[in-house]
């Protein structure tokens, strides 16, 4: 990509989705449009793509990048949990291929005003859609120490959640919690010194981002409707980036494949027995790919 953005696990995604002329495809986490562009190129001259993203800024960037494909592209501002509704509204149900990339996009991380990163100080926002819901600052102002500890422990899998929560609440009560930079420093001070070399705020920022955007609930809602989005033989690819996401995806896909022990009929066939990860070359070239895990399935 000319903007320096490299979509994660692109060859693997294209291999599983196998885009073809005349097909209909959905990228439910459009981002900068890297995967979408490759799908459109593979499905030329008349394959159609519906791109969904809850971040309006991402839609602007991707819209400009994909403009050359004209009316083969339909972009919709919505969370991926509304995918079936969106596809129905634009007359694209069922689709031949469906992609979900659950990672935070590089522009979100790189722009301090979005509040996702502690590398450059910015407002405590962290919303995927800046027009919706409470910010991280709002959340931190309303929760008590016990609630905050639970968020950090459950969504960040942080062993020092109690210490961090106490430090954050104390700083809040002193009026010191006013930016991502301040939050990162507060978390670092609460951590044992021997943990400082590992970007100590990473797990806490992940936890707050998940809580602000209701990310795990969004994934559950999406997986409830995925089979209804796909035609028989249609393919699904989901890329997760941390264990909380991947556990949900693995469990729900197994259930859809009739392997949950509930007696429910199978609606999909799992395509990869083991999770697919990036190869050494991609991991060296694209650091974002190092934690990516791809699972694929086919509608029965």
Language model regions located:
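S-adenosyl-L-methionine-dependent methyltransferase catalytic core, i.e., the SAM/SAH-binding region
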Residues: 1-300
């Amino acid at each position: 990509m000319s903007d320096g953005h490299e979509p994660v696990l692109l060859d693997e995604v294209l291999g599983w989705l196998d885009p073809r002329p005349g097909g209909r495809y959905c990228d439910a986490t459009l981002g900068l449009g890297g995967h979408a562009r490759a799908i459109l190129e593979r499905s030329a001259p008349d394959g159609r793509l519906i791109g969904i993203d809850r971040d309006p800024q991402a839609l602007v960037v991707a819209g400009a990048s994909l403009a050359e494909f004209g009316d083969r592209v339909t972009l919709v501002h919505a969370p991926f949990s509304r995918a079936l509704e969106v596809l129905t509204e634009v007359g694209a149900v069922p689709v031949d291929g469906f992609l979900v990339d659950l990672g935070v996009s590089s522009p979100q991380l790189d722009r301090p005003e979005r509040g996702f990163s502690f590398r450059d100080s910015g407002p405590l926002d962290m919303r995927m859609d800046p027009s919706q819901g409470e910010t991280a600052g709002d959340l931190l102002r309303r929760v008590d120490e016990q609630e905050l500890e639970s968020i950090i422990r459950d969504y960040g899998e942080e062993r020092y959640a109690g210490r961090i929560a106490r430090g954050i609440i104390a700083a809040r009560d002193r009026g010191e919690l006013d930016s991502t930079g301040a939050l990162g420093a507060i978390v670092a001070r609460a951590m044992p010194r021997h943990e400082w070399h590992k970007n100590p705020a990473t797990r806490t920022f992940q936890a707050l981002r998940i809580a602000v955007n209701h990310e795990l609930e969004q994934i559950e809602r999406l997986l409830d409707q995925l089979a209804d989005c796909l035609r028989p033989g249609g393919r699904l690819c989901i890329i997760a980036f941390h264990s909380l996401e991947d556990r949900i995806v693995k469990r729900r896909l197994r259930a859809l494949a009739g392997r949950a022990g509930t007696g429910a009929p199978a609606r999909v066939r799992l395509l990869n027995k083991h999770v697919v990860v990036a190869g050494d070359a991609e991991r060296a070239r694209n650091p974002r790919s190092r934690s990516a895990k791809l699972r694929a399935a086919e509608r029965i």
